[in-house]
Amino acid sequence: MRRIEAIGESPVFLRHIHAIEVAEVSREFCRHGLSHALDVARIAWILVLERERPLSKDVVYAAALLHDLGRSEQYATGEDHDVAGARIAAEVIDGLPERLRFEADERAMIIAAVAGHRGACDADVVAEGRQEMLIDLIKESDNRSRACYACSARAACYWSDERKNLNLSI
C-alpha cells in the first residue's frame, strides 16, 4: 500500500490534516482529523471484505483518508467541505509520484466519493456501479465511525437522532 503511505506523507495532505486538528482543538463535537480518517478507512475496508465488494484496498483507503480534508477550507473560508475536499483530493492524488498514481477511473471514483460522501445512502441496497458503491461505503463508514451512543455532547449535537450512531455495532 505504498500509494496510501505516499498520501499520508503528502505535504498537501499533512497541511490540511494539521489545519483541521488546530481548528478543532476545542471542538465539543466530533472531530475530523487523522484518527477519524483512519477509523473510516478501517471500517470501510471491513465492510468491503464482509460484503465481498469489488473495490481495491488502495481506492477505499484513499477515499476514506481524503474524505474530510475540505474541512480545513470550510473552517477558513466557509466553503462547503465536500466541494473543497474534492479539489484538495485531486491535488493530493495528482501530486503522487508517477509510479504511484491511480488509474483515471480510480481517481474519478475517489474524487466522487469525497464530493458525495454526505449524500443519500441506503446501506441495504447494493449500489449499481463501483463509483456509487464507494460513495455509499464512505458515507456509511463515516457515520459508523461516530460513537454518538457514548458522546457527552450528544444532546447538543445538531445531527438528528435518526442520523446519529446510537449503537455500538460493526
Task: Give residue ranges: language-model regions.
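Metal-dependent phosphohydrolase cores
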Residues: M1-I170
